[in-house]
Amino acid sequence: MSMTVEQMTKVFRLVMDDVELNRLLYYKTDPLSPSHPDVQSLENYYDSTNDSPAIINTIFKRAPKTDDLSDSPLCRMCIYLGNALPKPTNQSFMLLNQELMIDVYTHINTFEISEYRSLKIIDRVSKLFFNKNIAGFGVTVDYKRLLISNPPDGYLGYKMIFTFGASK
């Protein structure tokens, strides 16, 4: 497995294993309530059932996939690599600034009218990634949050861009 694939697998595993983040993405009401079981413990978290796909495949994507969001109201997180630009030669010709892109989509009528669910998700992701050494990429050197200008109908979208130092 290539080093980049291994690092992205670790990043994906970090968000996939986070209990609070899964609750924020999955449960429609009162996601952090102790009355809800952890999402990862649900029978169809990893495996699809006859009538629905696996939860993990619905709320997490490894690419910016949104063409299926109009089917039902949900929250989704897309995680993928962005640009990798060389650092100035006076810093090191062997290092890059690697962008990690995380898109967060929330259905407006279901999640944004009664609470700021997208902001809660963004805050949780920031706690997981900001100023941390993640999956061998290095420590975050820059962070941006941008509004996605053309989200799917009925959705609010934010793009989080974490820039890490990485080796070539």
From Swiss-Prot:
Organism classification = Bacteria, Bacillati, Bacillota, Bacilli, Bacillales
Write the protein's name.
SPbeta prophage-derived uncharacterized protein YomW
